[in-house]
Amino acid sequence: MDLPRGLVVAWALSLWPGFTDTFNMDTRKPRVIPGSRTAFFGYTVQQHDISGNKWLVVGAPLETNGYQKTGDVYKCPVIHGNCTKLNLGRVTLSNVSERKDNMRLGLSLATNPKDNSFLACSPLWSHECGSSYYTTGMCSRVNSNFRFSKTVAPALQRCQTYMDIVIVLDGSNSIYPWVEVQHFLINILKKFYIGPGQIQVGVVQYGEDVVHEFHLNDYRSVKDVVEAASHIEQRGGTETRTAFGIEFARSEAFQKGGRKGAKKVMIVITDGESHDSPDLEKVIQQSERDNVTRYAVAVLGYYNRRGINPETFLNEIKYIASDPDDKHFFNVTDEAALKDIVDALGDRIFSLEGTNKNETSFGLEMSQTGFSSHVVEDGVLLGAVGAYDWNGAVLKETSAGKVIPLRESYLKEFPEELKNHGAYLGYTVTSVVSSRQGRVYVAGAPRFNHTGKVILFTMHNNRSLTIHQAMRGQQIGSYFGSEITSVDIDGDGVTDVLLVGAPMYFNEGRERGKVYVYELRQNLFVYNGTLKDSHSYQNARFGSSIASVRDLNQDSYNDVVVGAPLEDNHAGAIYIFHGFRGSILKTPKQRITASELATGLQYFGCSIHGQLDLNEDGLIDLAVGALGNAVILWSRPVVQINASLHFEPSKINIFHRDCKRSGRDATCLAAFLCFTPIFLAPHFQTTTVGIRYNATMDERRYTPRAHLDEGGDRFTNRAVLLSSGQELCERINFHVLDTADYVKPVTFSVEYSLEDPDHGPMLDDGWPTTLRVSVPFWNGCNEDEHCVPDLVLDARSDLPTAMEYCQRVLRKPAQDCSAYTLSFDTTVFIIESTRQRVAVEATLENRGENAYSTVLNISQSANLQFASLIQKEDSDGSIECVNEERRLQKQVCNVSYPFFRAKAKVAFRLDFEFSKSIFLHHLEIELAAGSDSNERDSTKEDNVAPLRFHLKYEADVLFTRSSSLSHYEVKPNSSLERYDGIGPPFSCIFRIQNLGLFPIHGMMMKITIPIATRSGNRLLKLRDFLTDEANTSCNIWGNSTEYRPTPVEEDLRRAPQLNHSNSDVVSINCNIRLVPNQEINFHLLGNLWLRSLKALKYKSMKIMVNAALQRQFHSPFIFREEDPSRQIVFEISKQEDWQVPIWIIVGSTLGGLLLLALLVLALWKLGFFRSARRRREPGLDPTPKVLE
């Protein structure tokens, strides 16, 4: 059946690394098989199948057999019962002097699934060669019935002491004393390394006849041979038939007990010339033909005792000895002196080589073959870490023989200059299969150049190698390559992934370990990351064991298990990684710790194997080794639960109330919840599984819109029993009452799980266990339920244009305003200094069908803050903003939720405040309307109302000035000494203060100071210019001009006012930036130039210091006052010292007298002097009274 899209998505997400962390290995009921901890029972484990009977093969490399710690292998039943030791430690290799103590049998195990046999190796098995013990290693092959079948020891070489030595003693009467000969014989025998695979000795004695004292194979130890030699008595005889004795030894002694391939050595001891000397030539020739090396010892006691010249005797003995004589011929003065040549004779014999010299004679003696093992089609690969001076090698044992690559075969990747590093090649061996190259062998060398290396190669019968690829480790001491595993993910017979362990990788202060992943691409393995551990910062040795196991989770892909035996304070843990589509998911699906399984487990995970179904339930089980224990983990069947949900009817029609619930009209519906279990393993196709589900209505709402008819208001919990492959459906009745929100669908959520998760099947860790399906409301539009609205949005602001500002604020006539706006763009709007807000009048109208979930999106530029939205009273709907935080640059408002009716209209006003922290040259407000309904593209253009303005701000500045000097009178007696030789000082201040809301910039203060007349007479000296703002930059021009020190005569009576138009000036330009409420003071400090002011001709004059504010061309600010400027006036007056000429005085006097005379005459003519007499009356007494 088709799966809902949600299930597929959830399943795909679960396959993503880290999405889940559960798995189907049962940790509640493991089988823990105990063994000896001192023997390290559990160091290696292998699952074994014998005719359908399942066993566990467990290695115990420190197991004892008798008095020797040989190691051994156990077979253990998987269900119940005790383990049985196979006593492989008692297996003896014939014809060698072996040493089995500490040979570590069971250190490596390899099973052969073709014939159900397995190989158990003892890499430290050694054998005696002379005075040395060679640790060549040995493996034992065990058949399907747990019976030893053969030994495998490809590195075993014949010793240098592999010799058959026959001692030919002259026992004639002339030998005296015999006891000295016996002492010599015993001493030389003690020098020999007698034993299997080494020297064996036979003794013949001759005189007139020849007899066997003992044959070559009679005794197998020095002790026995010495004991036998001590009982040899002198046979006697009157003749010395040396040729006969040599021929007897050649033809009979070497045949009876002689070994094929052994070096034949003959030691002839005689004290006189032979009586059959004519036969010597033939006898010696036959000995040469049989490759018998002859040592001849001449005892001169008989000749010395009788004073006979021994020259002829010595020549005969030298003829008997092999060439050269100096190495094979000895002579002693008498029988007692034989003891003196024992050491020399022994050294010369042992200088012989037991086999022909070849390249491997001295390269494999310490090879430790079997340190690792791997079964291939035609035999077995064995790692030999000690071969070639511990650089290591890989040997191959087949039914046709053995293949031992030459040392030179490895030089390409293991150069001669690094031979002393001890690479340990063969520490682990495995193989991969590619479609082009077939089977390729893989071997690890964890100590190569201290970082480790892995090589991929093929081996040829001519003892050469072809190395196809090499991989090198990253970190010194990480032991990269100590564990290697190839993985065929999809089971097609071709390797997909090669995993390389570096268990000692040091990270964050701990030996955490690392496992590298290499994927096969075009016949090369390419690095593709690493597997992840638990991120627990501890010494874990993650990657100490890596096992490719068959499909554990029943998804048809093989999996990987990695051991970390030192995790959790050496308790140990394993990690299970799933295979998926040709690769390995790098996050573990399950981490199993030793503490979950049993108490006291240590080094859990040191070995892992998982290829068989051990309990006959159709599932692959795991075998894991630990210190003194072997643990079997059982797999649980995996089930996938397919869930689906549908509704009848398919939509909620709130306009059709078809039932009553709680006395109210309601819309009734039914949900059908269906489950189908799918067991992944074929063995479980008739199994049942119990699940429990929880169903919830409108789970994310505080008050649900739908209600269940039975059980809880919005929850139901039920248990059901499902049969494999069969669908079971549950009916859940529910109803919907009146609700304000019938736009968003009602969500039905289902969660389900196993009824008994601790037993039986387990839910697939990559399969969803939740289901969410929604049932929509019917929208009430036309028959196709497709609503087509037509939203129209209109908006305008209250900002004035430049023309409107000129007419309304500046109150200028239209003609003057036209000239005023010429300097502005037509899109410029003016922000008055008193304005703090911007208002937008807007309307939203729906000219089409119902618009569901209509929203109004309001956005503004950063220099505005949303203040409020006020709806007009005559609106047909409502509008509510859901986020009115002032700092947000966007607001979302719901319009008549849940739907905006057809032909409805809503009017509203928006207010925005200017930001006090952000200043921009422009202003943007955008209103956009939209809905969940599908409006036609042709009508969407008017859904947006953008308002964009280029701004000019009215600067609100206070511009003032002050001065310490406004008037000065120049007097004739004014002294320069009072003013330091210059003149009276002055201090002027121009002050600008920003009273507005916005920071002001793009303005310039321009100050002009008349400093001299056009004739070069200095008027004043500007001593200093200061501002109280460090970031205000000013430029000063004209203050450095040098004027004449002595003023010249100049009449200024016609120029009562001196300014920049008729004087030389100092100009100061300053760029101004003012934040709100900031002020800047410009200080002018100087002195009047009194020397010139006294010399110039004037009565009174004014020196005008002018300061003007100017806006720069691109400044966003304007001034309400045209060209604002301020002046400071220095009014200078002067007193004159006049001298009147004499003629003026005389003329003035005479003129005054003449004027007086004319005045008197005129008065006389007018009767001025007669008027008093004419006014007297006739009757009056003219005579005055007399005082008596």
Curated annotation (Swiss-Prot):
Tissue note: According to PubMed:10464311, highest levels of expression in uterus and heart, intermediate levels in skeletal muscle and intermediate to low levels in pancreas, kidney and placenta. According to PubMed:10486209, also found in brain, colon, lung, small intestine, stomach, testis, salivary glands, thyroid glands and prostate. Very low levels in peripheral blood lymphocytes, fetal brain and fetal liver.
Topological region Extracellular: 23-1141
GO molecular function: collagen binding; collagen binding involved in cell-matrix adhesion; collagen receptor activity; integrin binding; metal ion binding
Subcellular location: Membrane
Gene Ontology CC annotations of this record: external side of plasma membrane; focal adhesion; integrin alpha11-beta1 complex; integrin complex; membrane; plasma membrane
Protein's recorded name: Integrin alpha-11
Domain of life: Eukaryota
Carbohydrate attachment residues: 82, 95, 291, 331, 358, 449, 462, 528, 642, 694, 857, 894, 973, 1031, 1039, 1059
Functional note: Integrin alpha-11/beta-1 is a receptor for collagen.
Lineage per the UniProt record: Eukaryota, Metazoa, Chordata, Craniata, Vertebrata
Major subcellular location class: membrane
Domain VWFA intervals: 164-345
Keywords per UniProt: Calcium, Cell adhesion, Disulfide bond, Glycoprotein, Integrin, Magnesium, Membrane, Metal-binding, Receptor, Repeat, Signal, Transmembrane, Transmembrane helix
Protein family (similarity comment): Belongs to the integrin alpha chain family.
Signal peptide region: 1-22
Positions with a binding annotation for Ca(2+) 2: D551, N553, D555, D559
Organism: Homo sapiens
Membrane topology, as annotated: Single-pass type I membrane protein
Cytoplasmic side: 1165-1188
